[in-house]
Amino acid sequence: YGKRRHPKKLTPLAYKQFIPNVAEKTLGASGRYEGKITRNSERFKELTPNYNPDIIFKDEENTVMNQWPGVKLRVTEGWDEDGHHFEESLHYEGRAVDITTSDRDKSKYGTLSRLAVEAGF
């Protein structure tokens, strides 16, 4: 009580590293697949759109901005219906997101992945 926590050192994730260390569609990573959501399904109404061009990632601590001033998070894919993912992809349920940085600097991706894990994704 009353003590300030020291920020822990962020270790970037390695290419193709998962947290937890299991594939996206396994029960341990994301729970049971509930079925594809289409525009005509009842569950489509449960999806929450985000139209804000500046705030596209809930980041109460401004971790992306603090890590790289002037750089924004860039969502390249969220909910999808195009059929370009594997059949039980969480993109079809609105439970997966692909992200990068606005400057598209691949050297930042490991740290960006770690920030996403720390944020609860």
Curated annotation (Swiss-Prot):
GO annotation terms (biological process): animal organ development; cell development; cell fate specification; cell-cell signaling; central nervous system development; neuron differentiation; proteolysis; regulation of gene expression
Post-translational modification summary for this protein: The C-terminal domain displays an autoproteolysis activity and a cholesterol transferase activity. Both activities result in the cleavage of the full-length protein and covalent attachment of a cholesterol moiety to the C-terminal of the newly generated N-terminal fragment (N-product). The N-product is the active species in both local and long-range signaling, whereas the C-product has no signaling activity.
Annotated binding of Zn(2+), by residue: 91, 98
Function: Intercellular signal essential for a variety of patterning events during development. Signal produced by the notochord that induces somite patterning, dorso-ventral patterning of the brain and early patterning of the developing eyes. Displays floor plate-inducing activity. Binds to the patched (PTC) receptor, which functions in association with smoothened (SMO), to activate the transcription of target genes. In the absence of SHH, PTC represses the constitutive signaling activity of SMO.
PANTHER family referenced in this protein's UniProt entry, alphabetically: HEDGEHOG (PTHR11889), SONIC HEDGEHOG PROTEIN (PTHR11889:SF36)
Keywords carried by this UniProt record: Autocatalytic cleavage, Calcium, Cell membrane, Developmental protein, Hydrolase, Lipoprotein, Membrane, Metal-binding, Palmitate, Protease, Secreted, Zinc
Annotated positions binding Ca(2+) 2: 61, 77, 80, 82
Binding site for Ca(2+) 1: 60-61, 76-77
Main location: secreted
Oligomer status and interactors: N-product is active as a multimer.
Name of this chain's protein: Sonic hedgehog protein
Superkingdom classification of source: Eukaryota
Gene Ontology molecular-function annotations: calcium ion binding; patched binding; peptidase activity
Cellular location(s): Secreted; Cell membrane
Stated family: Belongs to the hedgehog family.
